[in-house]
Curated annotation (Swiss-Prot):
Family: Belongs to the universal ribosomal protein uL5 family.
Gene3D superfamilies referenced in this protein's UniProt entry, alphabetically: 3.30.1440.10
Organism listed in the record: Lachnoclostridium phytofermentans (strain ATCC 700394 / DSM 18823 / ISDg) (Clostridium phytofermentans)
One cellular component (GO) term of this entry: ribosome
InterPro entries: Ribosomal_uL5, Ribosomal_uL5_bac-type, Ribosomal_uL5_C, Ribosomal_uL5_CS, Ribosomal_uL5_dom_sf, Ribosomal_uL5_N
Keyword tRNA processing attached: no
Record function comment: This is one of the proteins that bind and probably mediate the attachment of the 5S RNA into the large ribosomal subunit, where it forms part of the central protuberance. In the 70S ribosome it contacts protein S13 of the 30S subunit (bridge B1b), connecting the 2 subunits; this bridge is implicated in subunit movement. Contacts the P site tRNA; the 5S rRNA and some of its associated proteins might help stabilize positioning of ribosome-bound tRNAs.
Keyword Ribonucleoprotein: yes
MF terms (GO), sorted A to Z: rRNA binding; structural constituent of ribosome; tRNA binding
Name of the protein this chain belongs to: Large ribosomal subunit protein uL5
Length: 179
């Protein structure tokens, strides 16, 4: 069992139950999945850019990335329907907790001028979205092998009903929210 999952079972569940007064332990919010999405705009012209992004994503997430395709044609972006424009990974279970642990304790502290993540990026349904500006903050990525700095979206999907519950859950996991 991963470190973060053990902390959840032993400490977080009890803390959440005490704070919100849940009657049943199945009511206690938990992390459902983490979705990592990387939009690669230049992929429509350059297939190598997408390959590099997929490779980086697989190194960071530890599992195979799915290539995302454009759903609609947009003339202003010179984009046609069905063209590959990015990649994503959905993490669940052990890999999800392992990634969350690495993100919170290793990657985020390596961000330049880091003062915490935005505490207002909840969607109203207990999910949290976080933008990462460069993939170099992850220790698995070798600086010399990076062709271009790319950002990504990391979405924490929880079973929490409200943003307040989700914020408390992520705070107990150690997410460094700015004041």
């Amino acid at each position: 069992m991963t470190r973060l999952k053990e902390i959840y079972k032993n400490e977080i569940m009890a803390g959440m139950q005490k704070k919100f007064g849940y009657k049943n332990e199945m009511q206690i919010p938990k992390l459902d999945k983490i979705v990592i999405n990387m939009g690669v705009g230049e992929a429509k012209d350059n297939a190598k850019a997408l390959e590099a992004a997929v490779k980086d994503m697989e190194i960071i997430a530890g599992q195979k990335a799915v290539i995302t395709k454009a759903r609609k044609s947009v003339a202003n972006f010179k984009l046609r329907e069905g063209v590959a424009i990015g990649c994503k990974v959905t993490l669940r279970g052990e890999k999800m907790y392992e990634f969350a642990d690495r993100l919170i304790n290793l990657a985020l502290p390596r961000v330049r001028d880091f003062r915490g993540v935005n505490p207002n990026a909840f969607d109203g349904r207990g999910n949290y979205a976080l933008g990462v500006k460069e993939q170099l903050i992850f220790p698995e990525i070798e600086y010399d092998k990076v062709d271009k700095v790319r950002g990504m979206d990391v979405i924490f999907v929880t079973t929490a009903k409200t943003d307040e519950e989700a914020r408390e859950l992520l705070t107990l996991f150690g997410m460094p929210f700015s004041k």
